[in-house]
Regions:
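Active-site phosphate-binding and catalytic loops of NTP-dependent enzymes
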Residues: 37-43, 65-69, 130-146, 239-250, ...
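Amphipathic heptad-repeat alpha-helical coiled-coil/stalk segments that mediate oligomerization
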Residues: 1, 55-105, 153-156, 160-165, ...
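Extended, charged coiled-coil "arm/hinge" scaffolds of SMC/Rad50-like chromosome-maintenance ATPases
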Residues: 85-100, 190-211
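ATPase nucleotide-binding head domains, primarily ABC-like/P-loop NTPase cores
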Residues: 247-250, 255-493
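Conserved amphipathic alpha-helical "coupling/scaffold" segments
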Residues: 1-111, 115, 220-223, 227-233, ...
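Extended, Lys/Arg-enriched charged tracts that mediate electrostatic binding to polyanionic substrates
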Residues: 113-163
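Terminal-proximal interaction/regulatory segments of ATP-powered molecular machines
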Residues: 498-516
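Extended, Lys/Glu-rich alpha-helical coiled-coil stalks
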Residues: 16-23, 47, 207, 214-218, ...
């Protein structure tokens, strides 16, 4: 995986230095190579596909041979470019011989050129003779229209059916209405025969040319196959690199301490101009993170961000996060996210989720990443909360890294007093009644139900009555959470102002340095 990440990062540098590499679409050439191995002759289309691979290899060699590339390390990419097979002689021969998928060039052989020259001369003679008939005062009145056309490969003229006996020749076709017959006049019969014979010679010569061109490729089937594989790998590498540039990604550091440290991580499928970055650290001081808070607050987005970025890094992709972000290579990534209720199996939401959890508990190891959305939901709240705690404790003792979202107060309390557990929440702007999507690690989420209801204008008596129904312990916890939340927010604001002041001081220092 380190090799794959190195390839991606070097691909990014290469694109930025030298633009996008000249890699186009290539076909599956397996069947073509089998035909060559059997000494068979390939079609024009097949020859073009193989020519494209040789041409692309030549272009890629040229792309990688720029002098300025020597100033950077491209050791991970160099073997791919160096191993490409180039044969300029074959490419030139093919370019001279083939026009497109349907046409062989006159210059493919001297014989073909001579045949086609004769064909053109005879065609001109035929047309000249037929035009004399079409425009003669004697025969023009017999014609449906003054047109020379072709039927069954032979030049004919359209004659009105009632005058068919007035033109000596052979009828090759009749119009659908029966009002027109297409006649080959005797005067061009021999020329048409001669032209037909030349067409046969042309087809035979083209077949011979295709056989010769196929023969040129026969000794290089292994090289062609290798080229196709190398180009495919390079296409994949530069696809990852292009994606990295588009999302402003960085290369993650890979640690062996089973830790996740994502700095300003962004969900890769959300507009990068709109997504709110989150910094997430797991595995150092705790291995279970419980994210609580209201719906639509961004809990699941955070969950998915952790999973997607971990999977991206393990796949050799750069990640949408700042430099020095670090990820562990997990043996498996498990996720139970969303309502996968099964109608066909008559499973409820709870049963569906629990079926997934059962699979995870039986397959997860200490080196796994486990992501669970709303663990224990869909059943009695008390039972669901206790079951969720027990499952998370099992995963924690297993040693896996776990992130779970939840609404349960019991999980917040448990995480506050249990080693290896940590609370987190997604910040919510009470004034504007909308989530900021900013992750706050160390602070459990608040439902904000009363505050939101009050802001929206619900009668204060109703809110007070609802508040009085909550037990004192829960009220004390919510008050404590509010104090922690307010303190944390104030610290974050001070931190942001300090960082901004520091940046301004650095810029001022640089400005004064340039003035001196």
């Amino acid at each position: 995986m380190q090799k794959s990440l190195k390839e991606t990062s070097q691909g990014v540098v290469l694109i930025q230095r030298n633009s996008t590499p000249p890699i186009g679409e290539i076909a599956d050439i397996t069947i073509y190579l089998k035909t060559l191995d059997g000494c068979g002759s390939l079609s024009i289309k097949a020859l073009i596909e193989l020519q494209n691979i040789l041409q692309m290899a030549e272009d890629l060699k040229e792309y990688f041979s720029k002098d300025f590339l020597s100033t950077s390390d491209f050791s991970a990419l160099e073997p791919y470019f160096n191993d490409l097979y180039v044969n300029q002689s074959i490419v030139s021969t093919f370019a001279r011989s083939i026009i497109d998928e349907d046409n062989i060039a006159d210059t493919a052989s001297a014989k073909l050129q001579d045949i086609r020259r004769k064909e053109r001369r005879i065609e001109q003679d035929i047309r000249a003779k037929l035009n004399v008939i079409l425009h003669s005062s004697t025969y023009s009145k017999y014609m449906r229209e003054n047109l020379v056309t072709i039927r069954s490969g032979r030049y004919v003229i359209p004659v009105k059916e009632e005058y068919r006996s007035s033109i000596k020749g052979f009828v090759h076709d009749v119009s659908s209405s029966g009002s027109t017959v297409f006649i080959e006049p005797l005067v061009v019969f021999d020329l048409n025969n001669e032209l037909s014979n030349l067409h046969i010679e042309e087809e035979q010569e083209i077949e011979r040319i295709l056989q010769n061109l196929s023969g040129l490729l026969f000794p290089y089937t292994k090289e062609l196959q290798n080229n196709a594989e190398l180009i495919g790998k390079l296409d994949f590498i530069f696809g990852k690199a292009r994606y990295s540039i588009d999302l402003n990604c960085s290369t993650p550091e890979i640690n062996k301490q089973k830790q996740i440290n994502l700095i300003n991580a962004r969900h890769p499928l959300i507009d990068q101009e709109k997504v709110v970055p989150s910094s997430i650290e797991l595995g150092k001081d705790f291995n279970v993170l419980i994210i609580t808070g209201p719906n639509t607050g961004g809990k699941t987005v955070t969950l998915k961000t952790i999973g997607l970025l971990s999977a991206m890094a393990c796949s050799g992709l750069n990640i949408p996060a700042d430099e020095h972000s670090s990820i562990y290579v997990f043996d498996q990534i498990f996720a139970d996210i969303g309502d996968e209720q099964s109608i066909s199996e008559s499973l409820s939401t709870f049963s569906s989720h629990m079926s997934n959890i059962v699979k995870i508990t039986s397959q997860a190891t200490e080196n796994s990443l486990i992501l669970v959305d709303e663990l224990g939901s869909g059943t009695d709240p008390l039972e669901g909360a206790n079951l969720a705690i027990s499952i998370l404790q099992y995963f924690s003792e297993l040693g896996a890294i776990v992130v779970s979202t939840s609404h349960y107060q019991e999980l917040k309390k448990y995480a506050l007093v249990t080693p290896n557990f940590k609370n987190a929440s997604v910040e919510f702007d009470i004034e504007n009644l909308r989530p900021t999507y900013k992750l706050l690690v160390g602070i459990p989420g608040k439902s904000n139900a009363f505050a939101i209801s009050r802001k929206l204008g619900l009668d204060e008596k109703i809110i007070n009555r609802a508040s009085s129904m909550i037990d004192k312990e829960t009220i004390n916890l919510e008050d404590l959470l509010k104090n922690i939340y307010d303190s944390k927010s104030e610290i974050e604001k001070e931190k942001e102002l300090t960082s901004q002041a520091l940046q301004e001081a650095k810029e001022l220092k640089e400005s004064l340095k340039h003035q001196n």
